[in-house]
């Protein structure tokens, strides 16, 4: 499976698609990426989503899963699979616990965000994937603010449920480097 660049004849606009091992575009991914291009998402966003969904469909192919019948447990296994080095992803090589993760937390979270958008898009088309990666949490639960600042009209939305991702990895926040006097 690979990501292929597509240049539209006439307009010259650039897009991306995921091509399977049979050299045919993967239909559900192609439909989603065409939707992103039609609502004028950045070509870089379309390219990143194509790479992320290529990883998802590669995982599904390795494990013999149907994309329409996945569960949250499969997504958790996908996260663990992403953290493995590429040579160990086929399952024939064991990885020692001392080996560093291949994908960092921020990269995995971006891939999960792409997968959540993909599932939400297809849920609107009738595929039963709506609650796979997004849960509704009561308002006020979750991350607490360090300050007491509340935006104007915050009291209006305090009783509505908020969307939360079901799986999120901690991503280290990079610290700025200190400038030297020299």
Outline where the language-model segments fall.
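General helical secondary-structure elements
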Residues: 1, 37, 106-107, 146, ...
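Contiguous hydrophobic segments
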Residues: 1-12, 104, 118-129, 180-182
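N-terminal DNA-binding module of tyrosine recombinases/phage integrases
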Residues: 2-39, 61-62
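Short, flexible segments with low predicted structural confidence
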Residues: 17-21, 28, 46, 155-159, ...
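N-terminal core-binding DNA-recognition domain of tyrosine recombinases/integrases
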Residues: 30-44, 54-153
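Long, amphipathic, Lys/Arg-enriched alpha-helical "connector/arm" segment
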Residues: 92-96, 100, 147-182
């Amino acid at each position: 499976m690979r990501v292929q660049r597509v240049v539209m004849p006439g307009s010259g606009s650039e897009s991306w698609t995921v091509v399977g091992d049979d050299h045919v575009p993967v239909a559900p991914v192609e439909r989603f990426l065409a939707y992103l291009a039609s609502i004028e998402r950045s070509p870089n966003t379309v390219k990143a989503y194509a790479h992320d969904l290529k990883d998802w469909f590669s995982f599904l192919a390795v494990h013999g899963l149907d994309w329409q019948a996945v569960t949250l447990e499969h997504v958790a296994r996908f996260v663990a699979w992403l953290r493995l080095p590429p040579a160990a992803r086929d399952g024939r090589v064991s990885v020692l616990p001392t080996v560093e993760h291949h994908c960092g937390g921020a990269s995995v979270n971006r891939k999960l965000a792409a997968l959540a958008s993909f599932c939400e898009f297809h849920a609107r088309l009738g595929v039963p994937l709506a609650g796979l990666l997004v849960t509704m949490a009561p308002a006020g639960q979750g991350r607490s603010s360090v300050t007491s600042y509340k935006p104007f009209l915050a009291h209006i939305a305090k009783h509505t449920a908020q969307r939360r991702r079901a799986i999120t990895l901690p991503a280290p926040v990079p610290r700025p480097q200190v400038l030297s006097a020299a």
